[in-house]
Curated annotation (Swiss-Prot):
The chain crosses the membrane at residues 33-53, 77-98, 113-133, 178-198, 226-246, 288-308, 320-340, 347-367. A ubiquinone binds at residue 201. InterPro entries: Cyt_b/b6_C (IPR005798), Cyt_b/b6_C_sf (IPR036150), Cyt_b/b6_N (IPR005797), Cytb/b6-like_sf (IPR027387), Cytochrome_b (IPR030689), Cytochrome_b_C_euk/bac (IPR048260), Cytochrome_b_N_euk/bac (IPR048259), Di-haem_cyt_TM (IPR016174). Heme b b562 binds at residues 83, 182. GO terms for cellular component: mitochondrial inner membrane; respiratory chain complex III. This is Cytochrome b. Keywords: Electron transport, Heme, Iron, Membrane, Metal-binding, Mitochondrion, Mitochondrion inner membrane, Respiratory chain, Transmembrane, Transmembrane helix, Transport, Ubiquinone.
Length: 380
């Protein structure tokens, strides 16, 4: 009898995606992060569902409903902190996943890469709206500051902001719609992930050498299922360690104060994973310019396939480009640090230099280094 996984219409899809999928034999642990992101997404949807059962999206009761979850609901504190820190783990995996794509030239799979960028925007939007829900000081003021950026759009800006707010300030209507969007977006993300995988399986996975690997493919199961399970164990270990020993390490103490429209916190800042983009936003003195720089800081990823000048795909054999890549990583870490600092000297100057450097590395240095390498190899 033919194996059911090869004949059943549903099992056939699963089989071609996760069992008999031909995979390059040499992909390293940097390729684990795709499956880890899937685990993070499932974890976030599950914990989020249980939180939504007890949360109320009303300005008068939102903060106390989160307190109620932590104090009165069975293991509510665990679910809440798994969800909050799960978001941090999600973004750590996301940044490494994107970084791996840049390093090994995975952006040459244009469709997969572009869907990935859309996914990144969707996850960032979801995380931002989720941060508003506990209705603490940083939730309220973060929502006010970030949504207010849309007022920089000429002519329609002010109307657009009031339309998003559902009034003349961030209030009950804003919180309710943010909760609705925060609930629905993860399911849209799941659909986008399926499209992402569909495009990936059209071309097959890239590998560290960046070379054609059709001659040396192995089945996904059992080799990479075992490898992914190891990665999953490590991820869950770090997440549980964070939740049980330092649940508030990555949060903001201001969010333990209920939202007060009459009292502005001294330093309004988003969650740590947005700090690099926030630093770029703050580095531009002009409001509209800042908003454009903020959007471009992520959208610039879409330019990478067009800026790829090298005859080689991966950075594995390109030492000058490797230096540029690690310069970019260091620059993003500096921007993350600056985003959490007050707006004063010397942080303003450091932020502006780091922001300019961010765009220079991607647009000028990386393509230039590839051309130099091709010249050295006499490939021009």
């Amino acid at each position: 009898m033919t194996n059911i996984r090869k004949t059943h219409p549903l099992m056939k899809i699963i089989n071609h995606s996760f069992i008999d999928l031909p995979t390059p034999s040499n992909i390293s642990s940097w390729w684990n992060f795709g499956s880890l992101l899937g685990i993070c997404l499932i974890l976030q949807i599950m914990t989020g569902l249980f939180l939504a059962m007890h949360y109320t999206s009303d300005t008068t009761t939102a903060f106390s409903s989160v307190t109620h979850i932590c104090r009165d609901v069975n293991y509510g504190w665990l679910i809440r902190y798994l969800h909050a820190n799960g978001a941090s783990m999600f973004f750590i995996c996301l940044f490494i996943h994107v970084g791996r794509g840049i390093y090994y030239g995975s952006y040459t799979y244009m469709e997969t890469w572009n869907i990935g960028i859309i996914l990144l925007f969707a996850v960032m939007a979801t995380a931002f709206m989720g941060y508003v829900l506990p209705w603490g000081q940083m939730s309220f003021w973060g929502a006010t500051v970030i949504t207010n950026l849309l007022s920089a759009i000429p002519y329609i800006g002010t109307s657009l902001v009031e339309w998003i707010w559902g009034g003349f300030s961030v209030d009950k209507a804003t919180l309710t719609r943010f909760f609705a969007f925060h609930f629905i977006l993860p399911f849209i993300i799941v659909a986008l992930v399926m499209v992402h995988l569909l495009f990936l399986h059209e071309t097959g996975s890239n590998n560290p050498t960046g070379l054609e690997s059709n001659a040396d493919k192995i089945p996904f199961h059992p080799y990479y299922t075992i490898k992914d399970i190891l990665g999953a164990f490590l991820l869950v270990f770090f997440l549980i360690f964070l939740v049980l020993f330092a649940p508030d390490l990555l949060g903001d103490p201001d969010n333990y104060t209920p939202a007060n429209p009459l009292n502005t916190p001294p330093h309004i800042k988003p969650e740590w994973y947005f700090l690099f983009a926030y630093a770029i936003l703050r580095s531009v003195p002009n409001k509209l310019g800042g908003v454009l720089a903020l959007i471009l800081s992520i959208l610039i990823l879409a330019l990478l396939p067009h800026l790829h000048m090298s005859k080689l795909r991966s950075l594995m054999f390109r030492p000058i480009s490797q230096i540029c890549f690690w310069l970019l990583v260091s620059d993003i870490l500096i921007l993350t640090w600056i985003g959490g600092q007050p707006v004063e000297y010397p942080f303003i100057t450091i932020g502006q230099v780091a922001s300019i450097l961010y765009f220079i590395i991607i647009i000028i240095l990386m393509p230039a280094s590839t051309m130099i390498e091709d010249k050295i190899l006499k490939w021009d």
